[in-house]
Amino acid sequence: MTKALFYLIFFLALFGNTFFLYGFLPEPLAVTTEISIILLFAIAILSKIGRGQVPRWHLFPGFLMICFVAACSMFFNQTEPVRAVFSLRLLYRFYFLYLALINLDLDEKTLKKFNFYLLILLVGQLPVVAYKFYHQGIAETTMGAYGRGGSLTAMLPVAMIFYMSAYYFLEKPRKLYLIIGLGFIFFSIVGAKRAVLFFYPIEFLAIYYFIYCKGKQVDPFRKAGVLILSIFMIGIVSASILYFNRTLNPEQKVGGSIDPAYALSYAIDYNTRENELGYTTGRFSTTRRIFSVLYNDGVSRLFFGFGPGAYTVSILDPQGSHRQIYQLEKRLGIGYGVTSMNRIALEYGVLGVVAFALIPIAFCFICRRQYRLETDPYWRAFAGGSMGFAFAMLAFFVIYHFPAFWGDTLPALYFYAMAVVYIRSRKANQTSVQQ
């Protein structure tokens, strides 16, 4: 039962939206993921209690804190309770998947089966991207089978490249890992994602230092050849992005000239600009505008935001909630660039941001610690990839699009990976105590 629910949750996370879009599955089944998580959570907790054991509630104080913040925000903003429930449900549903997984006492064999299943689903995105590329060319709609959420075309490859690099350097240098990694670089380029121009150089240098040098205990000054190769790889990939992305070259076409100065100027303007009506259309300008309004509106607004659900579409009243979001955007003067941090700030204020940020920050520390302690090559590679994933998600939380934590796909993968690292860390702690 638990395995079937797991397989269903992640199949829907990576392929479900395409099935809904083309009518292979009826739209009401879109709530199947949440029902499956509830069932899995209930099975895990009740099984734990049935064996006379205390369930693990890792990071649960952060959830209680945001519930308290939500209650205060509802009071100050006169928000309907149902809107708060819908908002918290979307934000924390995969955290409860995390709690379910860490309470199921999954053994190593089962975890490896789950990892392999997810690898198949993730690699299965590449043929879908190739098919869409054949029919659509280089475009933001050239994405995987998850069907929506264009920003995933940048974030998902970043995560996969961390894992493939870790397994190549720390487990076994299989060519398959390189091929999959290159496939996801292709994935992001044909998906026309500008952000990877800046993500990849940082990621490749992080892989070189933290996974290759630290992981293999190599002196970076004695392996300058690998560093040179990394820099060369950064140059090739960056040049390819500039050449193929219409918005990053002066000619505004696929196959334009490679002009880093133009691309940098465009990126700065893109992230800081406002349109002719004064609406912010960049992530940095939108972040500045949101926190400026929260600050200027007084202490209660700064701490508790505009109310849970203020920026969330309700399935009970989609038209009404869309109008509410439009009015809020009009009041703030924002048009584009809402990050996960921004969205939480809008609904829950600064205290909500602090409460939720405890999760990605804690996961960074857990992954870093486990990466240092893990001795098994397979699991050390997993910990190394997860460390990269955790720090990337912390960055996405602050500076990138909100599907990083509010979506259907990446949060499922993220909380699964963090659950596995936590399970391994518990096992390591138990082993050290026994010794």
Predicted feature residues:
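Transmembrane alpha-helices of multi-pass inner-membrane enzymes
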Residues: 162-163, 359-360, 366, 384-435
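Long extracytoplasmic/lumenal interhelical loops at the membrane interface
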Residues: 138-139, 143, 281-348, 367, ...
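Hydrophobic, aromatic-rich transmembrane alpha-helices
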Residues: 36-51, 159-169, 353-374
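Transmembrane signal-anchor hairpin modules in multi-pass inner-membrane enzymes, especially those
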Residues: 1-71, 106-112, 116, 166-175, ...
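Alpha-helical transmembrane segments of multi-pass inner-membrane proteins
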Residues: 110-137, 149-214
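Aromatic-anchored transmembrane helix interface
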Residues: 32-40, 57-71, 79-104, 116-117, ...
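Loop-to-helix entry and N-terminal half of a specific, functionally important transmembrane alpha helix
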Residues: 9-12, 335, 339, 346, ...
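A membrane-periplasm/extracellular boundary helix in multi-pass inner-membrane enzymes
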Residues: 190, 213-274, 295-297
